[in-house]
């Protein structure tokens, strides 16, 4: 049988391949996005597809829609960082066989394969694999981020982002549209440019919360677009006047959900618990340049993870930035080396 792992993260592809039963007699194939996945399917390489949802070119929903539209009988199991209830309902409605969250545990995959009749133990069986794309990596104690290391950071952020979105979706009873996280090492001037680019609205409200744990430290920053407050109040069933005090309460509630859930997910994957400081309001209804100038002394060279959250069918948008100190990068790189 031909099994296809379709995910834009090379790290996630390798992680999933390692989690499959060692005695499963299959040929493994790989695709880095939905279009490549469809090409592999048409080549006969996807009797069973393990499918990520958030990908460039064509996402997992697009793959399932294409399979359904073309009448292709390939079976798809979604393995996703986006674990919102609506994401589950959408993929099952598009004909997915099953849905599990990232990272997929070996015991979960084994139970799933048994449940759907894809696996039975046979003495001497080994998986015949087409090796996942990889390249030699040498640990670097400095701040260098290789493409392979960046890919791991992006996948860790993808899983954490999905967990935070799931909590927010349940709180608001709405669907959160998720992007592919941006990961970069930024100088101070570049960080200012990134903050300006992230904020495409006239004025913002911002909350910052510090965190620290075992050689890793940084700040989580929420940039909330002021045009979002009206719809956010509606989603949270806010009663009464929407004044600055009410907006601050909505802002803090949203920040607590997104920052707290993201940091828990990230810390769990690095096996490093974080202690979180008290959230600090950096400003309300202020232009991004004013926020940057007022707080520029806070930020130095940093590893930045940027995620834009949007609520489908509502004018609600905010940016979450995780800013890790330069000293933290070497510690995290070393932890990641043990995951590769």
What is each model feature region?
Residues 10-29, 69:
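Two-component/phosphorelay signaling modules centered on CheY-like receiver
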Residues 30-39, 59-63:
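Helix N-cap/capping motif at the beta->alpha junctions
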Residues 44-50:
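Active-site beta3 strand of CheY-like receiver
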Residues 52, 80:
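Active-site residues of response regulator receiver
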Residues 55:
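Receiver (REC) domain active-site loop signature in two-component systems and cognate sites
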Residues 62, 83-98, 111, 121:
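Alpha4 helix (beta4-alpha4-beta5 surface) of REC/receiver domains from two-component response regulators
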Residues 87, 122, 127-147, 151-246, ...:
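Composition-driven recognition of glycine/serine/threonine/acidic- and proline-rich low-complexity segments
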Residues 102:
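A Lys-centered signature of the CheY-like receiver
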């Amino acid at each position: 049988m031909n099994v296809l792992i379709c995910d834009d993260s090379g790290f996630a592809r390798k992680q999933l391949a390692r989690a499959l039963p060692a005695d499963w007699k299959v040929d493994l194939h790989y695709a880095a996005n939905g279009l490549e996945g469809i090409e592999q399917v048409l080549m006969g390489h996807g009797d069973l597809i393990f499918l990520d949802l958030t990908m460039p070119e064509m996402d997992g929903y697009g793959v399932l829609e294409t399979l359904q539209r073309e009448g292709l009988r390939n079976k798809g199991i979604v393995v996703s960082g986006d674990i919102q209830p609506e994401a589950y309902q959408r993929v099952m409605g598009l004909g997915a066989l099953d849905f599990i969250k990232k990272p997929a545990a070996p015991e979960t995959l084994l139970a799933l394969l048994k449940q759907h009749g894809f696996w039975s133990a046979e003495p001497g069986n080994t998986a015949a694999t087409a090796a996942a794309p990889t390249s030699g990596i040498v640990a670097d104690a400095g701040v260098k981020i290789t493409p392979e290391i960046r890919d791991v950071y992006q996948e860790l952020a993808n899983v954490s982002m999905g967990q935070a979105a799931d909590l927010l979706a349940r709180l608001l009873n709405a669907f959160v549209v998720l992007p592919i996280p941006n990961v970069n090492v930024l100088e101070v001037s570049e960080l200012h440019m990134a903050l300006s680019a992230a904020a495409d609205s006239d004025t913002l409200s911002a909350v910052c919360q510090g965190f620290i744990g075992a050689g890793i430290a940084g700040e989580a920053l929420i940039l909330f677009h002021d045009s979002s407050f009206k719809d956010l109040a509606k989603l949270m069933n806010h009663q009464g006047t929407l004044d600055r005090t009410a907006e601050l309460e909505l802002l803090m509630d949203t920040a607590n959900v997104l920052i707290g859930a993201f940091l828990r997910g990230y810390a769990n994957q690095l096996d490093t618990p974080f202690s979180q400081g008290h959230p600090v309001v950096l400003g309300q209804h202020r232009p991004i340049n004013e926020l940057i100038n007022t707080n520029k002394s806070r930020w130095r060279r940093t590893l930045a993870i940027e995620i834009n959250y949007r609520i489908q069918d509502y004018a609600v948008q905010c940016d979450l930035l995780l800013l890790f100190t330069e000293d933290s990068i070497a510690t995290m790189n070393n932890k990641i080396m043990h995951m590769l």
